[in-house]
Amino acid sequence: MGATTSTTGTSRGGRGARERILRAAKELFYTRGIHATGVAALIEAAHVSPRTFYVHFPTKNALVEEYLRRFESQTPIAAEAELGRDDLPPAQRLLAIFAPVEGEPTALFRGCPFHNAVIEGAGELPEIARLAERHKQAFRDRLVATAAEAGAADPAALGRQLAVIFEGANALAASCNDAQVFTDARRAAKTLLDVALGSAPGG
């Protein structure tokens, strides 16, 4: 995602104001962080007045909640899109979630917006924590379902273990700004899948 904060339109109110605020939140919260992004920056990026901002979002936390809901419904995480592919068999879809992150080599890897929001909330934003928990559980459920499609003897265990590898890789890649972590994660996942599915090593 780029670091630009410009939005379309210059009207400070009107029917498009809510969308401009949400677009600004998606850009700034993800690239700068929730705490580092003040309301003033959001107002400036969205080209709205303070009054208009608070009409749509009485608190910053209300905007954070809607930002995550919008992210979930309109911007699928790349790994989730891989699980939905119909051109790969189930086992390959499970490996595809560990594909290296594409983008500029110098770009910061920001990781999962839900994970980031929970960490920044530090237990003080319970509704945001619930949104993130629901999202992560849904992702684990998809991994379990795909593991069952692949023929795993214990799909629940395999799905949970793959989730641990994936979430750990996301966190480490974001902490170290090193997307190559996913290469190691993919190798670990491949070993796990070979054992769980009874595949021959090196296949």
Predicted regions and their residues:
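Helix-turn-helix
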Residues: G2, R20, A24-A62, E66
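N-terminal intrinsically disordered/low-complexity leader segments
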Residues: M1-G16, L197-G203
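Hydrophobic alpha-helical segments that form the core
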Residues: D154-S175, D184, A188-L192
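Amphipathic alpha-helical packing segments from all-alpha helical-bundle domains
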Residues: P76, E82, Q92-A96, E124-E149, ...
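Amphipathic alpha-helical segments used for helix-helix packing
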Residues: R93, T106-R130
